[in-house]
Each structure stands twice: as C-alpha cells, then as structure tokens.
C-alpha cells in the first residue's frame, strides 16, 4: 500500500480554520493552533447567544409594552390579564411594535382590555 502524505489535506483544513478566523486580532487570526481555539469559542458563543437573543428580545418587548401601558394608566400584568379575558391573541412582539409605531391603535387595544376587566 502506498504511503499517504497529508500535506494537501492538512493545508486545506488549516486554510478553512484561518479563513473562519479572518478579522481576529493578533495570533488568533493567523496561527492555526490559536485560531482553531478562537473559532471553536466563537461557535460556542454563537450557539449560546442564539438562545439568549430570544430571551433578550422578549424582555425588550415586555419593557416597551409596559412603558406604553403605564401611559394609559395600567400595569403590564393587569394589561396582559385583560387581553386574555378579552380573547385578544396578539403576541408581545406585535404589541410592542404597535406601542412604538401606532399609539392610537395600541390605545384602542388597551381600552378593550380595560373593558374586559371591568365586565
């Protein structure tokens, strides 16, 4: 069986890692052993933060809704309870968007929630 030299394969593998580390500072961008670790860590951060992003955005939407609802003289938790009672099935993303872009429309939804709680 002939001897297999791995020069081509190794070079391709190294190039792939170095390309992934493009833009990294210092030796993290041009030394294979260090770049490999940096790329792996970057992947771990990306994996973790794809999950954290969902939490962060939900928190942002809730904060925006709460601020807009308090202008109408209500708290967030009472507002959400009113929406449930009024059978309004808008998610927090849409509610936050309405609160920012369409204040009159959002105020109408708040009034419906208030009416449902009063009934």
Swiss-Prot record:
GO terms for biological process: ribosomal large subunit assembly; translation. One of its GO terms (molecular function) is rRNA binding. The keyword Transcription does not apply. Keywords: Ribonucleoprotein, Ribosomal protein, RNA-binding, rRNA-binding. One of its GO terms (cellular component) is ribosome. PROSITE patterns: RIBOSOMAL_L20 (PS00937). The keyword Cell inner membrane does not apply. InterPro entries: Ribosomal_bL20, RIBOSOMAL_L20_CS, Ribosomal_protein_bL20_C. SUPFAM superfamilies: Ribosomal protein L20. CDD domains: Ribosomal_L20 (cd07026). Binds directly to 23S ribosomal RNA and is necessary for the in vitro assembly process of the 50S ribosomal subunit. It is not involved in the protein synthesizing functions of that subunit. Belongs to the bacterial ribosomal protein bL20 family. This is Large ribosomal subunit protein bL20. It comes from Bordetella pertussis (strain Tohama I / ATCC BAA-589 / NCTC 13251).
């Amino acid at each position: 069986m002939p001897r297999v030299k791995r020069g081509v394969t190794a070079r391709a593998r190294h190039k792939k890692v170095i390309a992934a580390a493009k833009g990294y500072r210092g030796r993290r961008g041009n030394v294979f052993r260090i770049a490999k670790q940096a790329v792996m860590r970057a992947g771990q951060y990306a994996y973790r933060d794809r999950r954290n992003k969902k939490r962060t955005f939900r928190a942002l939407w809730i904060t925006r809704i709460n601020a807009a609802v308090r202008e109408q003289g209500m708290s967030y938790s009472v507002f959400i309870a009113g929406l449930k009672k009024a059978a309004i099935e808008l998610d927090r993303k849409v509610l936050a968007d309405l609160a920012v872009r369409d204040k009159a429309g959002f105020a109408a939804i708040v009034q419906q929630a208030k009416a449902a709680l009063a009934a």
